[in-house]
């Protein structure tokens, strides 16, 4: 019979690293949001005004997508953290079962 083992500690380290990446990405998104959602018109002609409005709308779309991505990212991190605990408990149960 073959056995599969995991390293729950490495799963936990991966979850922690991914969490830090998410924090960094969110901080970056928060920093650029005013710049990409309030694009100033370079001139007062109609084309410049419409173009700046278009860029601002794209900025709002980016902000909405970034929020959704953050929720998905945090859900993935939470899944990894839960998996770490599950794998750890399974490994303990397997060790207890094979040592008797």
Swiss-Prot record:
GO terms for cellular component: extracellular region. Its EC number is 3.1.1.6. The keyword Cell wall biogenesis/degradation applies. Keywords: Cell wall, Cell wall biogenesis/degradation, Hydrolase, Secreted, Virulence. It is an enzyme of class 3 (hydrolase). One of its GO terms (biological process) is cell wall organization. It catalyses: an acetyl ester + H2O = an aliphatic alcohol + acetate + H(+); a butanoate ester + H2O = an aliphatic alcohol + butanoate + H(+); an octanoate ester + H2O = an aliphatic alcohol + octanoate + H(+). It is found in: Secreted, Cell wall. Residues 4-94 form the PE domain. Involved in cell wall lipids remodeling and in virulence. Restricts the biofilm growth and is essential for the optimal intracellular survival of M.tuberculosis. Shows esterase activity with a preference for short-chain esters, particularly pNP-acetate (C2) and pNP-butyrate (C4). Has weaker activity with pNP-octanoate (C8), pNP-laurate (C12) and pNP-myristate (C14). Shows weak long-chain triacylglycerol (TAG) hydrolase activity in vitro. Not necessary for PPE17 stability or for its localization on the mycobacterial surface. Elicits a strong B-cell humoral response among different clinical categories of both adult and child tuberculosis patients. Expression in non-pathogenic M.smegmatis (Msmeg) strain induces necrotic cell death of macrophage after infection and significantly decreased IL-6 production compared to controls. Msmeg-PE11 bacilli exhibit altered colony morphology and cell wall lipid composition leading to a marked increase in resistance against various environmental stressors and antibiotics. Mice infected with Msmeg-PE11 have higher bacterial load, show exacerbated organ pathology and mortality. The liver and lung of Msmeg-PE11-infected mice have higher levels of IL-10, IL-4 and TNF-alpha cytokines. This is Esterase PE11. It comes from Mycobacterium tuberculosis (strain ATCC 25618 / H37Rv).
